[in-house]
Amino acid sequence: MEELQGYFEKDGSRQQPFLYPLLFQEYIYALAHDRSLNGNGSIFYEPLEIFGYDSKSSLALVKRLITRIYQQHFFLSSVNYSKQNRFVGHHHTNFFYSRFYSQMISDGFGIIVEIPFSLQLVSYLKEKEIPKSHNLRSIHSIFPFLEDKLVHFNYVSDILIPHPIHMEILVQILQCWIQDVPLLHFLRFFLHEYHNWNSFFITQNNSIYLFSKETKRLFRFLYNSYVYECEFVFVFLRKHSSYLRFTSFRTFLERRYFYVKMEHLQTEHLIIVCCDYFNGTLWSFKDPFMHYARCQGKAILVSKGTHLLMKKWKYNFVNLWQYYFYFWYQSYRIHINQLSKHSFHFLGYLSSLLKNSSTVRNKILDNSFLIDTLTTKFDTAVPVIFLIVSLSKAQFCTVSGHPISKPIWTDLSDSGIIERFGRICRNLSHYHSGSSKKQGLYRIKYILRLSCARTLARKHKSTVRTFLQKLGSRLLEEFFTEGEQDLSLILPKAILFPFQGSHRERIWYLDIIRINHLVNRS
């Protein structure tokens, strides 16, 4: 990192540094190698075993990669020429056809393209002296806001952010931020060559898929740039369509490795909250008549207005993606529902508005009368069906919810198997602690517990009943008791037993910075 700072000091222009030469610096790939900068792991760890290398030889591989880039750099000026140069036709010498080298370049690219944004952010924070905002780190921080505001609104729109995105659109978006022409040419060339052999992210139409756990840092960055452009245009349309003048505009920027509060414009009614994509990208803004929130590829738009107004914004989104991003987007993918009659799925919860009526008899002197009171409550429930579908995709149960064994984990020790199942169960309990009714969550715990028992029985070639009798109390403690210890610190008198007591208590945590993987599958 010190070498990187020294490079920009020598460059003399911190706002528009020359980024392309960084591809030939070993410390860039060392930063990509650092797990602290990559929460989802790096290709320098487990994937090295696939190629027959260990972590000790990674430095030699980096040097070999840089040497080959030096040898081929004059071919990178034109994408069309890539099919004619000498290394495309030979699989043994073509590092672009080697998955390992392409992943190294992808991770290095992900570090480099973030540099201009990081430098602008750091300089902006020093100039404004903006304090950190710790409470906004949690994904759960959005739910108290929804509880307070949504009870007064009429309609909600479920929006799916369109993907995949054409790679050329992504490069054009970056041109507004990065003026290093050689780097942009190399990026365009790399994406085209990446498309030729990799089918994880880029389809046959030269488009990039982002909703995969194997997605690399570079593609997460490209997706965030695309979504930022979408929402920037949306905010622009919102400001020009409102008859009310915006008096303030604040942005709370959440990143995986640093989190800060930023003020952008001196323009009380618009707030934007966001964080890194894979840790649960979360945007929301408010005005007197509309609220918007997004988590990864799913967004909701709620309004006090009429159904006609919501249809207007629906076609605004459709036209935005069709004419600005050249993406054919069907209008039926945006659903408009009445909040009082329909529920919506967002952030792993099934949310709805419940209306409760109560009658009170009042008496004044000899006159008595009845007063009917109607109250509206924001309710969040555990989406049991969605979670069962997620568990079935992860091979913990069948589609109908029948627990099955996990054969891929049978090579682990007994304690390792129990610990993995218990950790998943605790994470789900932690994330869904804000549910008003937790009986559905107990069913999920039961599926995981029995799946754990079946996995152990499969490993030891025994029956499930034998292991339930042998480890029944231990499994119960691992899957249920430990998950309730956090709640006992807050509500010690309310919790008597995991299946009884405060199953209706709703608790929002301020330390959840990412969505559980199983929740995200739904």
From Swiss-Prot:
Name of the encoding gene: matK
UniProt keyword list: Chloroplast, mRNA processing, Plastid, RNA-binding, tRNA processing
A GO MF term: RNA binding
Source organism of this protein record: Micranthus junceus
GO biological process, one term: RNA splicing
Primary residence: plastid
Residue pairs linked by disulfide bridges in the UniProt entry: none
Stored PANTHER family: MATURASE K
Keyword RNA-binding: yes
GO terms under cellular component: chloroplast
Location within or outside the cell: Plastid, Chloroplast
One Pfam family here: MatK_N
Protein name (database record): Maturase K
Keyword tRNA processing: yes
General function of this protein: Usually encoded in the trnK tRNA gene intron. Probably assists in splicing its own and other chloroplast group II introns.
UniProt record similarity statement: Belongs to the intron maturase 2 family. MatK subfamily.
